[in-house]
Amino acid sequence: MNFDVAVVGSGLAGLTVALHLADHRRVVVISKRTLPEGASDWAQGGIAAVLDSNDSHDEHVDDTLIAGAGLCDEAATRYIVENGRAAIEWLIGHGVPFTRDARAELGFHLTREGGHRHRRIIHAADATGHAVVTTLVDKVRAHPNITLLEDHFAIDLVTDAKLGLPGMRCHGLYVLDCKRGDVKTIIASQTVLATGGAGKVYLYTTNPDTATGDGIAMAWRAGCRVANMEFIQFHPTCLYHPFAKSFLISEAVRGEGGKLVLPDGTRFMPAHDERAELAPRDIVARAIDFEMKKRGLDCVYLDISHQSPAFIQEHFPTILARCLELGIDITRQPIPVVPAAHYTCGGVVTDQLGRTDIAGLYAVGETAYTGLHGANRLASNSLLECMVIGRGAAQDILGQPATAPTPTPIPAWDESRVTDADEEVVVSHNWDELRRMMWNYVGIVRTNKRLERAQHRIALLREEIAEYYANFRVSHDLLELRNLVEAASLIVDSALSRHESRGLHFSRDYPQTLPKALPTVMQPAHRRTSRKH
């Protein structure tokens, strides 16, 4: 299958790239599930941009740099912030139903979130991601130049190195048709990775099941640098229930007087921070983690039951309804909660146009490391980054020839030496073991001893998975596990190499912050030459 551009991933970043290209290029969008599926669709908050005359680019940049704890790239941050309004206007032009406010300058309601000094978050009620993605998916489905491959899983990139040629260029990729079970070869002049983050590497995550670090792992295997993978943002309060994966309990519950308590009803936050339940997100997450590990607890509890049922119904109707479905009446009893992996701040190293170290290969959205998020992401900057870098990547692609010559015929996928898997239990066991180990050893609070144990076990898991991959036909679950163990390895190696505590990385062995902030850049051992930006 031949296309001008292959876009891997169907969240906001991937859809933005595809729609900016489609009038001038033949585009294929590859999604491993049916659309819409991905973290963008789940995003509740909104999109940060300077949309009011009382606000300024300088202040938005400054807020971002403060949150990033010294590791933001200031030039990249300024570029993204300054292009924010144009990105929002593009969405409005496509008909995204943002919440309106007749009194606002632009006519839309702006809210304020932690770390922002002004109201600058444009939103669609409390389901912004869904509103944006649903609108764009309809446009993608209707465009004659876009081919949509749903239930297709990108396996690996086809590069010069894979073809045994000198140079560093990407020529497309191999893709598994998950329904038919066969592997397709997709040839493309440019390939864009927009597969999201790696939250599923942890036992508890707010991310959808698709967040298995696919793009990061593919780019790393192909020879791209990866940066700052130790910085994983954790949300402090995710509902703890076997039938409720990834359901967030909003920080507003604590804002309206909710108290964090142990199983016996004792509050613990005042002992950790004078701001108690209103301390910043990372401090609350660390405190909960400390109490759980110290006491061997599966969860702690968030109690809002002292407020009236009418108050709870008015302020938290969704949380009340979801908990009631699961047999938890939050007007009478506390909510079981755990911290959960929320956002991957690191990723594939790119420039401001999404270009990676390999010619013809781009990375956008949570897959990429542009330098915007540094050591900690500022709320609602992630969807902004998806759109601005996505549009920049599309413009860069449009400035190049539509069809690049393929140097040699790309061979079909070779299944001559593999058989059907007869031990699927190996995949499911390793999947469970990896995620539990990452949660216990590489979580919110880290120690060298735990990290070294994780590193040792990951090395063994990688060997087992590589052997399995070499001997059996690829499957959806096997490919996800292969990518997850790669992402886990990058997180652990990055964490071990940082001898300080900064932003989201907190080490008991190195509690101090060093005077100089330096990014952690991992370089593949097999890389031959580097393309400089």
From Swiss-Prot:
Listed cofactors: FAD
The record's active-site residues are R281 (proton donor/acceptor)
Q: What's the Enzyme Commission number for this chain?
A: 1.4.3.16
User: Domain of life, per the record?
Assistant: Bacteria
How cofactor binds (record note)? Binds 1 FAD per subunit.
Question: Cross-referenced InterPro entries, in alphabetical order?
Answer: FAD-dep_OxRdtase_2_FAD-bd (IPR003953), FAD/NAD-bd_sf (IPR036188), Fum_R/Succ_DH_flav-like_C_sf (IPR037099), Fum_Rdtase/Succ_DH_flav-like_C (IPR015939), NadB (IPR005288), Succ_DH/fumarate_Rdtase_cat_sf (IPR027477)
One CC-aspect GO term: cytoplasm
Return one Gene Ontology term, BP aspect.
Answer: 'de novo' NAD biosynthetic process from L-aspartate
Q: Where in the cell is it found?
A: Cytoplasm
Catalyzed reactions: L-aspartate + O2 = iminosuccinate + H2O2
Q: What are the site positions for Important in orienting the L-aspartate substrate?
A: E113
Q: List, in alphabetical order, the Gene Ontology terms for molecular function in this entry.
A: L-aspartate oxidase activity; nucleotide binding
Binding sites annotated in the UniProt record for FAD: 10-13, 32, 39-46, 214, 366, 382-383
Gene3D superfamilies on file? FAD/NAD(P)-binding domain (3.50.50.60), Fumarate reductase/succinate dehydrogenase flavoprotein-like, C-terminal domain (1.20.58.100), Succinate dehydrogenase/fumarate reductase flavoprotein, catalytic domain (3.90.700.10)
EC top class, as a word? oxidoreductase
The protein's UniProt keywords, in alphabetical order, are: Cytoplasm, FAD, Flavoprotein, Nucleotide-binding, Oxidoreductase, Pyridine nucleotide biosynthesis
Which pathway does this polypeptide act in? Cofactor biosynthesis; NAD(+) biosynthesis; iminoaspartate from L-aspartate (oxidase route): step 1/1
Which residues form each disulfide bond in the chain? none
| Pfam families recorded | FAD_binding_2, Succ_DH_flav_C
Answer whether the UniProt record assigns the keyword Plastid to this protein.
Answer: no
Function (record text): Catalyzes the oxidation of L-aspartate to iminoaspartate, the first step in the de novo biosynthesis of NAD(+).
Q: Enumerate the PANTHER family for this protein.
A: L-ASPARTATE OXIDASE, L-ASPARTATE OXIDASE, CHLOROPLASTIC
Family, per entry: Belongs to the FAD-dependent oxidoreductase 2 family. NadB subfamily.
UniProt protein name: L-aspartate oxidase 1
Organism, scientific name: Ralstonia nicotianae (strain ATCC BAA-1114 / GMI1000)
- Organism lineage string: Bacteria, Pseudomonadati, Pseudomonadota, Betaproteobacteria, Burkholderiales
